[in-house]
Amino acid sequence: MRSVRTWGPGLLLVSPSILLIGFFVYGLIGWSANISTTNQNSRFERAAGTSPDAYIGLGNYTTLFGSPDFIASLKHLGILAVVYIVGALFFGMLWALLLEKGVRAEGLFRAVYLFPMAVSMFASGVVWNWLLNSDTGAGASGLNQLFEMAGLGFLKNHWWVSSPTWGIASIAIPAVWQLSGYIMALFLAGFRGIPADLREAARIDGASEFQLYRHVLFPQLSPIALSALIILGHMSLKMFDIIMAISGEKNVYTSVPMVTMWTLTGQQDFARAAAVAIILLVFVGLLVVPYLVHTSRQEKNS
């Protein structure tokens, strides 16, 4: 009875959240997984006269992985993720290093670097659609127009309609611009959290600035770097609005699974759209679950 009085009020307090999360998160995940094993609302199966709720097992997944378009979208996603993660980590660390050294008007620089985060992905995509205008002729705008005015016309290119590789890579440019400030804030907080005694001890031992950062400071930032990697990784998997704003859903060079899911939903092929969603969920799980296990073990060891 005493134990109930101890944890009972707390359970009562969090029970609404548990119920809402259980229904709107895990319940809908289960519902989507169930739909992905049927031919629900697929025009092709309905035209064939079969039940739209007929169970077909992993048929939708087999169809997706047998589709060249879906395989291409997975390759595009891989290119996007690599460019996005590497770019955001590089510029985030670079800006954190510059601010960590102590510069005048540091608050102004922090605000400038963090400002892109205050802009929605779609609004950012609209602006970058103009900057990355693919027209290289008289109607060129944005960067292509700037190159022409600066006498650097040889740098003009078609950006996101150029090739299967560079098309999706160019989409990562605005995404890197938008998230680098956030990564900078993480690394800067990590630098500021390192005790000054460690720096002084390393300098007394004769360590140069390069050795100080390489052997003392950077190892202290490894947990933050891992967290940043996981955050950027899962954000790259669900990137959608900025792609739609820049290139739309019909550009084969910038198609990713999220865009494929949107297209299938518009075609009322809800079963295959749900299958794409579950595939993305598995990818996210492959990123997040090992990180949670690693973090939990570290907490137990400490």
What is each residue range found by the language model?
Residues 1-5:
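Short, Lys/Arg-rich, polar N-terminal cytosolic tail immediately upstream
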Residues 6-302:
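A structural signal for multi-pass alpha-helical bundles of membrane permease subunits
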